[in-house]
Amino acid sequence: MTVRVRIAPSPTGNLHIGTARTAVFNWLFAHHHQGQFILRVEDTDRERSRAEYTENIKSGLAWLGLTWDEGPFFQTQRLDLYRQGIQTLLDKGFAYRCYCTPEELEQMREAQKAQNQAPRYDNRHRHLTEEQRQGLEAQGRKPVIRFIIDDDREIVWHDLIRGKMTWKGSDLGGDMVIARIADNPDQPFGQPLYNLAVVVDDMDMKITHVIRGEDHIANTAKQILLYEALGATVPEFAHTPLILNQEGRKLSKRDGVTSIDDFRKMGFLPQALANYMTLLGWTPPDSTQEIFTLTEAAQQFSLERVNKAGAKFDWDKLDWINSQYVHKMSGEELVDLLVPYWQEAGYPINIDSDRPWLEKMATLIGPSLTRLSDAAKESVLLFGGRVDYSEEAIAQMKQDGVKDVLQAVVEKIQESSQLTEDEAKDTIKQVTKTFKVKKGLVMRSLRAGLMGELHGPDLIQSWLLLHEKGWDKTRLTHGLSLVE
């Protein structure tokens, strides 16, 4: 048997972290078993579905490295297939036309509420005679299609994460609507609904394993009944834990960042985010291993090691994983990723003419980055001919003998248009010897004059970057003018 799984997002919003984590687990499972990963777009909600959300979902999955083997398939292009399934259920007596009005259904719910009963359809139109149906239609009523759910039925399945699952038919809310009222009088019924469309799709696409969030467990019970009624083999099911916020509630838009776009803009690398999502509910055989590619994770992945309990989203853990990936990247690899953040900060750069210089910048600040978005903050002292001086930097430059030291450095800079690392170190050595001061004083004073702060990235490498732009002389001269 070839393993076939699917991710089936609805394009009613941008790609959500929960959907993306489900996609990761499906992708890992498929690749572990040399199977196929299928993308299906469940776009039957025509009012809320948008083409731009579909593109966002596709680009988000691709950005994370979750390439699909088949698709994308769109449910709006498969309506005839669903109608065939509905007609089959009608012909076999597993479904019927229900003519209840919205007002009657509301009255039903209110009566149940008054008796402290859970709201459910009472199946009143399940056994209408042909004469009764004709009478209701003569009143101008249009039917929905309902699937019969036996209240006495016990639905049992073995969940690959949760073990034996049991659901009572009486807990499923009565006979289930599987098609809306027809918009077109030429059609026997209207828009097919979620549970019916999902089952028909999974049958047609020969899905062997349905891996999705635990919030779908009730749907699974309903869908098993539909598979059986349509004469199909029921796939295996696995219900993954929800992603929780730090308070233990389901992660939602109220928590702020939830879409993959949000994480991308915040400066997380796709491989780091995919790595983190892999661990968000799954424990590898070697529980000490935390850094791996999707391919490496797929080799070890099994549903048996997916947790049942909700997985708390840990920002510190994600930051740490992201930093591990960032710190392994060269300046050449980083530079194009950092440019947008420098540009957003308004730093004066030209990506074409400044590329070699920017690569050196990326090399310098790379080890201090946690997120790519930290680039603006970490390099703020390295852009421009002027810099704001902290009180500590001013105090450092006012120390006895420091002005002479810095002036000597300015003169050395003027003697040569080029500055190598060895020359920079030699200049510090010569000034230290000439003025008979400690090297530490020279280094602190030079940092204060060049950077405006007493702490920051490597001093020599920072100086070399500033010198390429001619900003070292400008800054030192300005700094000296402040302490005269």
From Swiss-Prot:
A motif ('KMSKS' region) lies at residues 250-254. InterPro entries: aa-tRNA-synth_I_cd-bd, aa-tRNA-synth_I_codon-bd_sub2, aa-tRNA-synth_I_CS, aa_tRNA-synth_I_cd-bd_sf, Glu-tRNA-ligase_bac/mito, Glu-tRNA-synth_I_codon-bd_sub1, Glu/Gln-tRNA-synth, Glu/Gln-tRNA-synth_Ib_cat-dom. It is found in: Cytoplasm. Zn(2+) binds at residues 98, 100, 125, 127. Binds 1 zinc ion per subunit. It catalyses: tRNA(Glu) + L-glutamate + ATP = L-glutamyl-tRNA(Glu) + AMP + diphosphate. It is an enzyme of class 6 (ligase). This is Glutamate--tRNA ligase. The gene is gltX.
